Amino acid sequence: MAKKVKAIVKLQIPAGKANPAPPIGPALGQHGINIMGFCKEYNERTASMVGTIVPAEITIYDDRSFTFITKTPPAADLLKKAAGVTSGSGTPSKSVVAVISKGQLREIASVKMKDLNAVNIEGAERIIEGTARSMGIKVE
């Protein structure tokens, strides 16, 4: 018989830097799971991606055990890294903070493809291009 799911918690944590301090401690502690066990396992799994934010979806079961999956970094972070900026535009419709090429857009779309609701790479590119536009990043 399958275990009964108690909760699903979604967190965005810097890769390799999970610790029991907020926001991880309170989010997981209220469900009674081993926070240090999660932190160690997360840090091992994301050690190769240090410096990026990696979302994790933690499934917590009634017997206080847990499983988690890591996803690809947020599209906004990948776009900021590709454009070489620290933040998007405050007024994206009026000011452009950076320009990225179609090649960079395709590269980001291929990385994000498994997490996006797109049938093909062109659909994924359009989704990422919309995110870029809302951040004030122009695609040429």
Curated annotation (Swiss-Prot):
InterPro entries: Ribosomal_uL11, Ribosomal_uL11_bac-typ, Ribosomal_uL11_C, Ribosomal_uL11_C_sf, Ribosomal_uL11_CS, Ribosomal_uL11_N, Ribosomal_uL11_N_sf. GO terms for cellular component: cytosolic large ribosomal subunit. SUPFAM superfamilies: Ribosomal L11/L12e N-terminal domain, Ribosomal protein L11, C-terminal domain. GO terms for biological process: translation. GO terms for molecular function: large ribosomal subunit rRNA binding; structural constituent of ribosome. Part of the ribosomal stalk of the 50S ribosomal subunit. Interacts with L10 and the large rRNA to form the base of the stalk. L10 forms an elongated spine to which L12 dimers bind in a sequential fashion forming a multimeric L10(L12)X complex. One or more lysine residues are methylated. Pfam families: Ribosomal_L11, Ribosomal_L11_N. Keywords: Methylation, Ribonucleoprotein, Ribosomal protein, RNA-binding, rRNA-binding. It comes from the Bacteria. Forms part of the ribosomal stalk which helps the ribosome interact with GTP-bound translation factors. This is Large ribosomal subunit protein uL11. The keyword rRNA-binding applies. Belongs to the universal ribosomal protein uL11 family. It comes from Dehalococcoides mccartyi (strain CBDB1).
